[in-house]
Amino acid sequence: MSATSRRAVLAPPRTRKGGAQVAPPGPPVTATPRLFLQLVRDRLGLLTSATAAYGDAVRLTIGPKSIYLFNHPDHAKHVLADNSAAYHKGIGLAEAKRVIGDGLLTSEGEVWRAQRRTVQPMFQNKRIAHQDAVIAGEAARLVERLRARVGGPPVDLAGEMTRLALGVLGRTLLGADLDRFHSIGHAFEDMQDQAMFEMVSLSMVPLWLPLPGHLRFRRARRDLYRVADRLVAGHPDGGDDVVTRLLASPAGVDPRPARRRMREDLVTLLLAGHETTASTLSWAFHLLDRHPEVRERLRAEAVEVLGDRPPVYDDLHRLRYTAMVIEEVMRLYPPVWALTRVAQRDDEVGGYHVPAGADVMISPYTLHRHPAYWTDPERFDPERFDPDRAHGRPRYAYIPFGAGPRFCVGNHLGMMEATFVLAMVSRELRLAHVPGRPVVPEAMLSLRVRGGLPMTVHRA
């Protein structure tokens, strides 16, 4: 039986007066135990199977929650952009607030707008263009570390990408060397683990209980707050960086005490500013090893454009194939795999009624695999992003950086960093998987590689 016919048999949508469908189709309430188990063990599998079985609009009832999963470019445009005022941050927000506080990722309304205005100037193209030497320098240090491991035991590439991304973040935005804070990467892993535990347990387990995960979380939060305190305490006056802007910004509509505000805003920036780039680069090197023809073409472009010099900002438009590779990596493994919202008032999406208070989800992971917009969607094919082939594709079929007012503020910086790193590493080195070691995606706050990514280093 086809997915289309299953939709018709299993869950025909109800209609209300006037013909609008009341609720999308979806699994029956009796499927709640199975869905909950999938939510805990295989979140990506849950979303993929739901859209395959029921189509572009699915209602998932999991315990007391009903999640409205929409999987069409028009749906994404409506929820995230055109009618974004009717939707606030959604599923997992309360849990994320308990873990990382009220920073830019979790705030709403006037508080969020004030926070965005504070940091946005740091991400303008003209400022980013002047950071090219800093980013190339961090990439060169990565190449040097990897070069020292040629022919040696495997290196945890995911860990190296985290170290690199934190190094770039520290020098470009914070005016600090974050390499001296060795615990940051592990602390964020513990924070993510706790955030997902909070979400799937519906925050029903008190944080004060001395469970191993709670103890790791409290230690991680303490370590990150210490990092934030040291960044503020050792910060020089008059710098051109985020710390300076945060220190100078008035509290305004933000009700948090000053010290808590600085801590939470810096921890949020540390998390958001490194996690997505580190994840994208990890998946990029994984896919390049699986597709040597792509790796060799990328290397040839790097050699032709750069020779043996470091890249500069003006090279970005010349490293076009490298950018296409990164775009395809983010199609298959979008760093943010789910964008969640809560409807603030009754709405209609794709002909379906969405009641006020409903949990709504747009998943870039499933949207980027929609067969109507992506031929052979599981295949790694950077040529999809050749301008000639991309022409006519709906804009909202591809949203690796989100969409609408909450579009990722650091997208240009992240793309420059990823482009420089792929070009500089691939020009000189080849990274290979450890035989027999599976590479499995893990849907946490970002889409990371479960258990790290051990790879051996070889000369190109």
Q: Residues of each region from the PLM?
A:
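N-terminal targeting/anchor module and adjacent flexible "hinge" preceding the catalytic domain
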Residues: 1-67, 74, 92-98, 230
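Cytochrome P450 heme-thiolate monooxygenase catalytic core
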Residues: 2-24, 88-94, 107, 111-113, ...
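Cytochrome P450 I-helix active-site segment
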Residues: 24-30, 132-136, 186-190, 239-244, ...
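Conserved cytochrome P450 K-helix E-x-x-R motif and the immediately C-terminal K′/meander segment
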Residues: 35-55, 226, 230, 309-350
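Cytochrome P450 catalytic domain signature, combining two hallmark sequence patches
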Residues: 77-96, 375
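Conserved cytochrome P450 K-helix/beta-meander segment immediately N-terminal to the heme-binding cysteine loop
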Residues: 85, 362-390
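Cytochrome P450 catalytic-core helices
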Residues: 276-295, 299-301, 412-429
